[in-house]
Design a protein with these regions (language model features):
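Class I S-adenosyl-L-methionine-dependent methyltransferase catalytic core
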Residues: 1-164
Length: 164
């Protein structure tokens, strides 16, 4: 596992403030790992976050964090944790999102196909934003939905929007 660094996460969310108001947004966190982005989205006021992670231990960790939050706040979290294959989830998902974050393993051979898949399945609402974390060896600047690229050390983010 290679979690998004705190430095990179803080910086990308500062950039995102110019794109989206997270208050009451519906978000999707793909390849959610330990749930760091999921919890960040929750803390920023998202009304619902669907978190998709295949790894059993990571999924269990997210569940435990949510259970602790529920005990502290006295209400059920707005997070829906799903343990499953991200590609299978995306292909069958009928919901649209204001915000999508994907942080696949950098060595994943299907990594370059993910932006196309997100838009083919129409998962992003009008004016929604998709943030894709990837290694430095990838360049998505020619993608029709690409809006900008940010790099923080070895962590790279490509931002995409729906074309209206």
């Amino acid at each position: 596992a290679r979690p998004t660094t705190d430095f990179a996460k803080e910086n990308i969310f500062n950039v995102l403030n110019g794109y989206i108001d997270f208050e009451d947004a519906v978000a999707l966190d793909l390849f959610s790992g330990t749930g760091s982005i999921t919890l960040e989205l929750l803390s920023r006021g998202c009304s619902q976050v669907i978190s998709v992670e295949l790894d059993r231990d990571h999924h269990r960790f997210i569940q435990e964090c949510l259970n602790k939050l529920t005990k502290v706040e006295g209400q059920r979290s707005a997070v829906i944790p799903i343990r499953g294959d991200v590609f299978r989830f995306v292909k069958s998902c009928k919901q649209q999102f204001d915000f999508i974050f994907a942080d696949p393993p950098y060595a994943l051979k299907e990594l370059p196909t993910i932006p196309d898949l997100i838009f083919e399945k129409n998962l992003l609402k009008e004016d929604g934003i998709f943030v894709f974390e990837h290694g430095k060896d990838y360049d998505f600047s020619q993608h029709p939905h690409f809006v900008e690229h940010r790099s923080y050390g070895s962590v790279n983010f490509s931002l995409f929007k729906s074309i209206v």
